[in-house]
Amino acid sequence: MSILPGFALVVLLLAASSAAADGFVLKKDVVLGSPAAAGVAGPMFVMANQIESTAPNVIVATGNVEARQAGQNFFADWLRYDTTLNFVDARGQVRLEQPTLWVSGDTLKFNLNDYSGELTQPTYQLIPQQGRGIAPPLQQGSGNALPMQQGRGNAERIDFIDANNSTLADATYTTCPVGNDDWFLQVGELDLDKTRQIGTAHNATVRFLGVPILYTPWLDFPLNNNRKSGVLAPTFGTTQRSGADIVVPYYLNLAPNYDATLYPRLLSKRGLLLGGEFRYLLSEAGGVNRLDYLANDRQLDRSRWEAVLNNTYRLSPTTQVGMLYNRVSDDDYFRDFSNQAAITSISNLNQEIWIRSQHSNWNAELRAQIFQTLQDSTSPTPITPPYARLPQAHLGMTQTFGPGIEFKLEADATYFSNPSMVEGARVLAYPTLRLPLTNSFGFITPQIGWSSTYYALDSSAPERRISRNLPIFSLDSGVTFDRPFSLGGTDYEQTLEPRAYYVYAPYRDQSAIPVFDTAQLDFGYAQMWTENQFIGGDRINDANQLTLAVTSRFTEAATGLERLQITLGQRYYFDSQQVTLPGVAPRTSNTTDVLVAFSGQITHDWLIGGSGQFDTQNGSTISQKLGASYRPGPGRVLNLSYNFITQNTNQIDLSAQWPLAQRWYGMFRYNYSYFDNKLVEGLAGLEYNGGCWLLRGAVQRLATKDAQSTDSFFFQLELNGMGSIGSNPLHVLKQSVPGYLPSNEIFPTPNENLPTP
């Protein structure tokens, strides 16, 4: 054996025995940086049990061959290297390691000039440059993608086209760990583009537990976390109103800062609904715009549609313009096409354009706003449409001067339009002065303001010109006492925080003033500390009242964790009420109900909370809400709540997520109204975590606002790195079961042992 002169490489010729004796080893390229440019690969370093030259500029290495050159490592039982052609021929337990691809097989032929070659019977593993897997483009951060893992597979042959492209024939692809082929993609040809980080499969079949479940003649997918254009996983579902529901979205990655999604939706009872969404984010603008259109609803023999336009544009660092447009074709659109309670109960859709300017001590807004009111066809009482604001101008200002005196101004001018009611303009201004005085143990804040309002009404009003002017005075004060104590070996701090809030506003007759945008607030803890019991500008209460409350907090001294907070409060009236809304009787009592509220994390696993409103004069309960949540660990949550309001609500709400067996989780919700004698929402679901795949199913019954209910079924199979198939129940589960976590977020590593109950 010899080292040939004139080699453009360095050969380390070491017998196995001498290598062991002298301690020499070949330091392989662990980092595997980017390959050198074609034709300038640089020297090759070789180590083997035996190395010999068999021809000019040709060496043959035998036994435990290790070689390194230009950011890639070779391993084989036998390797031949031609320095003239810069060509490698390797056989027997061949392994090639590149920055984004590790591959092993039987025989390798590889040209180091252009990185072309061929490997037979390969087994490969992809090493993504960003992250460790694939996330659906529009679902990042939503919990819809399974844990990201490296892709792997095998093939009959792999052809290396160049440094960044290769093709595998008769290949498989999966993200399951080695030894687990629960699911894999079987393809006739698989192209890997490492520059674009995209894999393209031809004649692809998805096999799950040995059963083919999906075939496509063409499929591409990202090899990292980057977004890319392509068909997203289809979703399947069913509802009573629309029947089978199939959606096949197509995602368009138009640019890093804007994209679009097209989603044809086939509804077996109604027809084909075409939908599209466009999103963009620029330095000076941004928005989300969506349109759904069903040309002919077979149930109603007419078109159905929904439009949502939400856009903003920044004119300057302090000024923005924007528009929001929500509209549907008919009153029943959401009941027919949605299975979310928050959507099916929508009554008014907002449509507005605006311009806003925000500065350090003042802000201004000009807008025009109208609503689409959705009537309930099954209800005998029609919904009164809210007033349109055509237009509304608002000005806010704050300024501090002198010895901490705070000046604040809220001014508003609006024309209210509603053809079925009194219309007109309202101008109001409310300047205030307040002086906050605080120290380490308490505070006192006096405030005085002057409210001025002017109305110019149309000819249908009894009085066309109305003015209202009145002063408003308030005094807010509170102190804090604290003491340390120990319980069960743990140091705590308890506070006692009494607070008093006095308000005075003289009576002004407001019976001739129409109600444009005003409602009476329900009495609660937050409303105890407000000057006005009405929200909106059309009523200002006459007030001569004092609110007293006390709060006590129990806090761990070492951690600052608040274990328990309890509040007790009541308001006292010194004059009878005179200002009311039309049809509402004035109060007859000189005190309000007593309010009680509590919350806290009483142990590591238990959270509690509740509130109550009690009529002390009649000894009755007006309302109460009690809740508890037991959360001993991720994926283990039990929620219980009870909600009662006199002559209105009497509901119990139970929900849970819990491991049933190893890899199995169960979820449910039972929300029942005893007042209406009906199920508000019922949900039952199961979830199985297979490590590199996840199967979940759920069934939901949801009461709609028309006193009926709708049933929905969800069934979804998630394949790690390939997306999901079926109807996605995650939004429903997270909304219905507070604290719910998908099991792949609880145990993000597929090899990790999953718990038993």
Regions found by a protein language model. Name each.
Residues 15-17:
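N-terminal signal peptide c-region/cleavage motif recognized by signal peptidases
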Residues 30-41, 45-47, 62-78, 91-105, ...:
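Interaction modules related to DNA damage response and DNA replication/repair
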Residues 8-13:
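Hydrophobic helical h-region of N-terminal Sec-dependent signal peptides
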Residues 1-7:
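Bacterial N-terminal signal peptides that target proteins for export
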Residues 101, 107-173, 178-189, 193-757:
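Outer-membrane beta-barrel proteins and related beta-barrel translocases across Gram-negative bacteria
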Residues 21-29:
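Cleaved targeting-peptide boundary
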